[in-house]
Amino acid sequence: MDVNLAPLRAWDDFFPGSDRFARPDFRDISKWNNRVVSNLLYYQTNYLVVAAMMISVVGFLSPFNMILGGVIVVLVFMGFVWAAHNKDILRRMKKQYPTAFVMVVMLASYFLISMFGGVMVFVFGITLPLLLMFIHASLRLRNLKNKLENKMEGIGLKKTPMGIILDALEQQEDNINKFADYISKARE
């Protein structure tokens, strides 16, 4: 299946006003995780544009450190995903605590980058865009169109870059399993 970039959402949909933002329920981690995953899939192109602008500014000021930081983060992420596929304890951690898994990847990347002296580039060029994405995805309430797009991604009708990353973090399998269970119950 071809990988397609999701459409760029309108600014008034991305930042509609305070009525479409709410604090997540920190007691219900699965509901909060579902909101974050749904928003990451739905607004992925908007997040990509915001991150690209921030990375471009930092990359313009310090291109070598930005490239080095990006390469280190990608290699550490791929290493942790590979290790999680081969070690059961890491796989469970990645599936149950995806935020902690990403934080471990970022901390490991930070320590590697600090050896090369590019800590400020890491903080402003890599960590800040990821933090802003996570905050927006946590606070933004989902709408009906968001939920419909996510179902299409979840059952495999569409494949996007963020969907591939979330699959690597094993954050979409539950949605597919729930949908398959729903269809099998509807047939009975």
Swiss-Prot record:
Instruction: Identify the InterPro entries for this entry.
Output: Prenylated_rab_accept_PRA1
Recorded hits in Pfam families, A to Z, give: PRA1
> What membrane topology does this protein have?
Multi-pass membrane protein
Question: Which protein is depicted?
Answer: PRA1 family protein 3
N-acetylmethionine sites (modified residues): M1
Cytoplasmic compartment ranges equal 1-39, 85-92, 136-188
Q: Give Gene Ontology CC terms.
A: cytoskeleton; endoplasmic reticulum membrane; plasma membrane; presynaptic cytosol
Instruction: Please tell me whether the keyword Flavoprotein is annotated for this protein.
Output: no
Task: Quote the function comment for this protein.
Answer: Regulates intracellular concentrations of taurine and glutamate. Negatively modulates SLC1A1/EAAC1 glutamate transport activity by decreasing its affinity for glutamate in a PKC activity-dependent manner. Plays a role in the retention of SLC1A1/EAAC1 in the endoplasmic reticulum.
Name its species.
Answer: Mus musculus (Mouse)
Q: How does it assemble?
A: Homodimer. Heterodimer with ARL6IP1. Forms multimers. Interacts with ARL6. Interacts with prenylated RAB1A and RAB3A. Interacts with SLC1A1/EAAC1. Interacts with RTN2 (via first transmembrane domain). Does not interact with VAMP1, VAMP2 or VAMP3.
- A Gene Ontology BP annotation from the UniProt entry: protein localization to plasma membrane
Localization in the cell: Endoplasmic reticulum membrane; Cell membrane; Cytoplasm; Cytoplasm, Cytoskeleton
Tissue expression per record: Expressed in the cerebral cortex, cerebellum, hippocampus, olfactory bulbs, medulla oblongate and limbic system (at protein level). Ubiquitous.
Per the UniProt record, the lineage of the source organism begins with: Eukaryota, Metazoa, Chordata, Craniata, Vertebrata
* Outcome (variant: L112A): Significant decrease in interaction with ARL6IP1 and no influence on SLC1A1/EAAC1-mediated glutamate transport
